[in-house]
From Swiss-Prot:
Descriptive protein name: Dynein regulatory complex protein 1
GO CC annotations, alphabetized: axonemal dynein complex; axoneme; motile cilium
Residues covered by region (Disordered): 27-50, 71-90, 425-461
Species assigned in the record: Chlamydomonas reinhardtii
The UniProt record lists the keyword Cytoplasm: yes
Lineage, uppermost ranks: Eukaryota, Viridiplantae, Chlorophyta, core chlorophytes, Chlorophyceae
Length: 698
């Protein structure tokens, strides 16, 4: 922005200078054309007037030449300043690019160092551990060396700026001296030219003195007056130009000093930040070194303890074998007793399950009623708030259009969009989800002696597993599964990861994908399709996670059928964020059990869906109140405050004027009374008896 403004000012100065040059050249050409005509009438107009014309021409040429010398200093200074600013901007951009490149490289190196710390705990050979620690130390030293190099470059650039500032001050001082020399030379040359031309004019008029004395005296007086005016105009222009040049020089000097001060402060701040970061890295390195030494000593002590523990456990093993035989006998007796207890508890469980279902239906009924009442109260309060906000907007419109005369733009209609579209839809859905989740949990938890219920649950589980296995075998889904294995491997348990590493290479990918899906709670084909839709490039899962209104995307199966191939996947850097949004929208979560995502909702956790719906409803309500409180911007509020202050001043002025008008009316009334009293005194009969009546004096 500063470069564009300086470029515009420079072009404006160049155009103004060209215009002045063209006007002076036109004046010179008019003088040259007029000179030919004056040569023909030289004898008619006389030597004095001819000398005046030639003197004006010469003075104009002298003035034009000296003005060019004076303005050349400013033009050269403007060009040099423009080049300096362009070079300064290029240097700033280069330094910024170096800082960004070093920050990115340092971030990558720090990430690499941080990632390798976790691998050191799995190394058991001391020599290998020492080699890895040594490599980590070398990596840290390389990071510190790169930052020291960048700090050195910044310090060199700062010193270069100091030297450049000193040189600039010297160059400006030289330009000022040169400008003063040109100005003094201009003054001397113009003064000498005026003196010489005046002498020539006087000599010409002295030659005609004998013939035209009276006329020449009048002309000489006019010429002297004209010369005085010219000298006065010249001095005025000279002083104005001097003041303008001084103000411009002072402005440029202040601008350069401010820019230098700002740049110096910014560079010193960057140096301090880098030094603090360096000290923090050194402290972190020292702390990690001490931790590793301590852990090494602890491991040595534990190794000794483990050796002693193994010897003691061998002795205990023989004793435990004897105890095992006695426990088997006790187990047989206890097993018979617990079977009888299990039959009794099963009957009790069935009775409690029926009571729980009845309680759940009552809970859904009361929740629907409460939600409906809440929606009605919310709708009523929302309408009241909208009416108040519309009144506020109407007042804002009146202030802008009638008081200020400004254009007023109404806010978007989306500001008054209702939070709950249907009074009972949100509560009914939440209650249904709650009931479905509870019923599913009860059905999944009830493993009793009823063989028919168990067979139905097993059949449903087998169907879901078959759907999921079919999706995993589909070659079009391998890209998405590979993306999950690469970016979501942290969801796999450490023990499971160790077991997967022992498998053959061709089986590791499928087993890893299944483990990740179980961690995400994906248990059937519909949940898997929803996950693939969330990982597609054109998915709106993040908008839905934020509670924003977004069009419902098509299913992954429809998308693949329309395209006839694999859908375009999201970038790997955004995969984790998409998975997080998927968990927030569908309420899935890490699951360690064999059922994956639970028993209800197609692999989705019902209670978590309810919590997600309630959270999104709360966010929409919070967003509604935020819109209502910010419908009038801070700028309009400041305008109201300023308008109120000015109207208060205007009211005070009107009140003062009203008081002045009352004073004027009082004075007029007193004046009328005095006039009537004076007329009464003047018309009194006693005035006729006086020797000098007042009527003769007034």
């Amino acid at each position: 922005m500063d470069e564009l403004q300086s470029q515009t000012e420079r072009e404006a100065r160049i155009l103004a200078r060209r215009k002045r040059i063209q006007e002076r050249l036109a004046a010179l050409r008019e003088g040259d054309h007029g000179g030919g005509k004056e040569g023909e009438n030289k004898e008619e107009i006389g030597k004095g007037k001819q000398q005046i014309i030639e003197s004006k021409r010469r003075l104009m040429r002298v003035k034009y030449r000296t003005d060019q010398d004076v303005s050349s200093v400013r033009v050269a200074g403007d060009d040099r300043e423009n080049q300096h600013r362009i070079q300064e901007e290029q240097t700033r951009q280069d330094l910024r690019a170096k800082l960004l490149a070093e920050a990115e490289q340092s971030a990558r190196q720090n990430a690499a160092v941080a990632m390798r710390w976790a691998d050191l705990f799995s190394i058991e050979v001391p020599q290998d551990l020492y080699n890895e620690i040594e490599s980590q130390r070398q990596a840290c030293e390389r990071i510190i060396a790169s930052k020291d190099k960048l700090i050195g470059e910044i310090k060199g650039e700062l010193k270069k700026k100091d030297d450049e500032f000193v040189k600039t001050l010297k160059r400006q001082a030289e330009d000022i001296d040169t400008l003063l020399q040109y100005m003094s030379r201009q003054f001397v040359e113009v003064q000498n030219a005026y003196k010489e031309e005046l002498d020539e004019i006087e000599n010409a008029f002295l030659q005609e003195r004998s013939d035209l004395l009276e006329s020449n005296r009048r002309e000489m007086q006019e010429l002297f007056d004209k010369r005085s005016r010219l000298e006065q105009d010249f001095m005025d222009r000279y002083l104005a130009a001097v003041e303008a040049y001084q103000s411009q020089l002072e402005g440029h000097r202040q601008m350069d000093a401010e820019e230098y001060h700002i740049l110096k402060i910014r560079l010193e701040t960057d140096i301090q930040n880098l030094e603090q970061h360096l000290e923090a890295m050194r402290a972190t390195y020292q702390l990690n070194t001490e931790k590793l030494e301590y852990n090494y000593r602890v491991l040595k002590e534990r190794e000794k303890e483990n050796t002693q523990t193994i010897e003691s456990q061998k002795k205990k093993l023989s004793r435990q074998r004897d105890i095992l035989s006695s426990l088997k006998q006790r187990y047989a007796e206890t097993d018979r007793r617990y079977r009888d207890d299990n039959m009794k508890l099963t009957d009790e469980y069935k009775r409690i399950t029926e009571q729980f279902k009845d309680l759940q239906s009552k809970f859904r009924h009361f929740e629907l009623v409460d939600t409906k009442k809440y929606k009605e109260v919310w709708g009523m309060k929302e309408a009241d708030v909208a009416a108040l906000v519309r009144q506020l907007l109407q007042a804002d419109k009146v202030l802008h259009e009638q008081q200020l005369g400004w254009d007023w733009r109404p806010p978007d209609d989306a500001v008054f969009a209702p939070v709950h579209g249907d009074a009972g839809s949100g509560g009914g859905a939440a209650a249904a989800a709650t009931g479905g989740a509870a019923g599913g949990a009860a059905a999944a938890g009830g493993v009793g002696p009823n063989g028919e219920e168990e067979s139905e649950e097993d059949a449903a589980a087998r169907v879901r597993e078959a759907e999921l296995a079919e999706r995993l075998r589909d070659g079009r889904n391998w890209g998405a599964l590979g993306l999950l294995c690469d970016e979501a491997g942290f969801l796999i348990d450490i023990k499971a990861r160790n077991m997967i590493e022992r498998l053959p290479k061709d089986e590791q990918g499928q087993v890893k994908a299944e483990a990740i899906l179980r961690s995400l709670g994906i248990a059937d084909g519909s949940a898997f399709d929803a996950l693939l839709e969330a990982l597609s490039a054109d998915s709106n899962i993040e908008l839905r996670a934020k509670g924003m209104v977004a069009p419902q995307g098509r299913g992954m199966a429809e998308e693949k059928s329309d395209r006839g191939g694999t859908a375009v996947l999201v970038h790997p850097d955004e995969a984790v964020r998409r998975l997080k949004a998927f968990v927030e929208v569908y309420g899935t979560g890490p699951s360690r059990g064999p059922g994956g995502g639970g028993g209800g909702g197609g692999g989705m956790s019902g209670p978590m869906r309810v919590q997600g719906a309630m959270r999104r409803a709360a966010e929409r309500e919070q967003e509604f109140w935020s819109r209502m409180t910010h419908v009038i911007s801070d700028k309009h509020t400041r305008v109201w405050g300023a308008l109120e202050k000015q109207l208060e001043k205007y009211l005070a002025l009107l009140q003062e004027r009203a008081g002045s008008l009352r004073d004027v009316e009082s004075l007029q009334h007193q004046n009328n009374e005095l006039r009537a009293l004076l007329n009464q005194y003047l018309s009194s009969r006693i005035n006729d008896e006086l020797q000098i009546p007042p009527t003769q004096i007034i």
